[in-house]
Regions:
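Hydrophobic, small-residue-rich alpha-helical packing segments that form membrane-like cores
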Residues: 141-148, 154, 159, 168-169
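Flexible, glycine-rich active-site loops centered on histidine and acidic residues
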Residues: 106-112, 134-135, 186
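A short core secondary-structure module
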Residues: 158, 162-208
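A short, Trp-centered hydrophobic/proline-enriched beta-strand micro-motif
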Residues: 128-136, 180
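Alpha-helical interface subdomain recognition
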Residues: 1-92, 99, 112-117, 124-129, ...
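Short Gly/Pro-enriched turn/cap motifs at secondary-structure boundaries
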Residues: 140-143, 167-170, 185-187, 213-222
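Long, acidic (Asp/Glu-rich), low-complexity accessory segments flanking structured domains
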Residues: 229-247
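Flexible, small-/acidic-enriched active-site or ligand-binding loops
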Residues: 147, 203-232
Length: 432
């Protein structure tokens, strides 16, 4: 029976190295560099390349990929433990070669790409030389593929791509886009959509504008409103078979959702650390904040909620490793997705309140973290949709009763128990 919560000693050594390396070398980058996806920033690359070289020398580069692609092929449990460290810094995933959306794009290129596609797009992505964009969500349809209108129509030997996409991550820095489009409107969206790899320099690829999150300016924004206008592609640009986009997307998004949750744990622990430090450092008339019952309650609630969420994430990661089939853990991943923004929001809000006016200022990270919590409630599908997924998957394990009363109706259970053990109660029955 394998059921323990201990980390293999050899891997714990690697985690300890990561923890120190990220704390001392990587976290400071968040305060001196602009964007980890901007490969044209020569100063940033001058700093990042030596750090990436250290990670590669340690054998910790692109750990989500197998040895055939230059990674160690870590399972989701190891990735979860690793991402709980990397999530502390916006630059850490880039330093370790596992940054979204590039990591997810690399996975589907590895699974579904042709060899020429892997040579042109995957290898430079794995080497950290370029950035990529996953262009799926639409202004009207959101993340629901049944409402997508972006389409690609066959014209001789070419495909002509037209449509608009919304919130396309890192479009401004991307060397190529992976675009989901309707190719057969006569059948179900689940079978009538295809994925295309679109080089950024292709005529007709236009960024309408960059879209900031919260108070981000358009100049600093990391997402884009895209328009694809008569973009001409060939079959060489197809990722996978025509009509296979939905299946490809599920492979990509399943892993992406759990990885977001893993990194969120790091942010939760950062907020909790700040909360506890503040409680011990700040005093009122009656002593430190930590001596107040209401503050102790907030600290206890936060610690419990973080540990509950961490266990939910780790269990989902363990099941992914065990079954190697995202369909079998669909409701586990959806449950993680639902729990993530709430615990993130609640813990950060408590930490913010303990810091008073300082907490809502731009001298502390809480407002950015709160916005991050709301982003997590929408990224890769809104919370409400994932709640529906959880409920539907769970209800499949049950069936309705044909009786008038519930199956756990106490009089019925009592009568059945009496029948089962009647021989032991004959004297009582005789006396009645």
């Amino acid at each position: 029976m394998a059921w323990d919560f201990e980390t293999d000693p050899d891997f714990q050594t690697e985690l300890d190295w990561m923890d120190e390396f990220v704390r001392d070398e990587v976290e400071p980058l968040d305060f001196v560099l602009d964007d980890p996806y901007d490969k044209s920033d020569e100063r940033a690359m001058e700093i990042l390349r030596p750090l990436q070289a250290q990670v590669k020398a340690r054998g910790l580069w692109a750990c989500h990929l197998g040895p055939e692609l230059g990674g160690p092929g870590y399972g989701q449990v190891k990735l979860a433990l690793m991402n709980q460290i990397l999530g502390r810094s916006g630059f850490a995933p880039t330093v370790f070669g596992c940054q979204a959306p590039d990591s997810g794009n690399a996975e589907i290129l590895a699974h579904f790409g042709t060899q020429p596609q892997k040579d042109r797009y995957l290898q430079p992505l794995l080497d950290g030389e370029i950035s990529s964009c996953y262009s799926m969500t639409e202004p009207h349809g959101g993340a629901d593929p049944t409402l997508f209108t972006t389409n690609a129509v066959k014209d001789g030997d070419e495909w002509v791509l037209n449509g608009e996409k919304w919130f396309s991550s890192n479009a401004r820095y991307a060397s190529f886009f992976i675009v989901m489009a309707v190719t057969n409107p006569e059948i179900s969206a689940y079978e009538g959509m295809s994925m295309f790899i679109v080089p950024a320099e292709t005529p007709g690829v236009n960024i309408i504008r960059n879209v900031g999150i919260g108070t981000e300016s358009e100049e600093d924004a990391s997402h884009a409103y895209m328009r694809y206008e008569n973009v001409r592609l060939t079959d060489d640009n197809l990722l996978g078979e025509p009509g296979s986009a939905f299946g490809i997307a599920q492979v990509r998004l399943g892993g992406g959702r759990i990885h977001h949750a893993m990194r969120t744990i790091a942010q939760l622990e950062k907020a909790f650390d700040m909360m506890c430090e503040r409680a011990l450092s700040r005093s009122t008339r009656n002593g430190p904040l930590a001596s107040l019952g209401v503050v102790q309650e907030q600290i206890a609630d936060s610690w419990i909620e973080i540990e509950q969420f961490k266990l939910l994430v780790m269990r989902a990661a363990w099941k992914i490793d065990k079954y190697n089939d995202y369909r079998r853990v669909r409701h586990d991943i959806a449950a993680v997705k639902v729990a993530m923004p709430k615990v993130y929001h609640d813990v950060v809000l408590r930490a913010m309140h303990l810091h008073g006016a300082l907490g809502v200022s731009n001298e502390m990270p809480f407002t950015r973290m709160l916005i991050g919590a709301e982003v997590m409630a929408l990224a890769d599908g809104p919370t409400e949709v994932h709640k529906t997924t959880v409920a539907r998957q769970v209800l499949r394990q049950y069936k309705a009763t044909d009786d008038l009363f519930p199956s756990r109706h106490l009089p019925k259970l009592k009568a059945a128990a009496r029948d089962k053990y009647a021989a032991y109660f004959e004297h009582e029955l005789a006396a009645i």
